[in-house]
Amino acid sequence: MTASGFDLTPPTDDERRRLEADLSPEEADVLLHHGTEAPFCGGLLGQKDDGVYGCRLCGLPLFRHKTKFESGTGWPSFWAPYDETHVKAVRDTSYGMVRVETRCARCDSHQGHVFPDGPPPSGQRYCINSVSLEFTPTGTPLPDPLGRGDNEASGEHDQRG
């Protein structure tokens, strides 16, 4: 369990197959094959409501609305994760660049990249694909596609959102 009350145990093979079967082709390309959606096209880019952004594949909360900011890059950007342990950093040397890829710590799905050019207080910019995320408005139970019972972890979704 994380400090915020979520189980990071990876999905079983059967659970993973079930979750992957529910993805659109674009979601599968980004989440499973490390693709990138076109800039300025993502459905969550202009989302300004209070709530939580969770992993589209497994439902783990990854970012809060209050850490989202307008970066001008064309992808939703956040200056901090929901819980540091929910987002995993992996060195990415694809396309002749050295970057830090961000993945969901529970299901290992690709989310985007993190760069050291964000606003205070962290100085980080988590640049995330909209199709990698699922938005849950404050006051609505978080998704629990794995049936772990942690979708109301600590019962603080309204306060944490």
Language model regions located:
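A short Gly-Trp-Pro
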Residues: 7-161
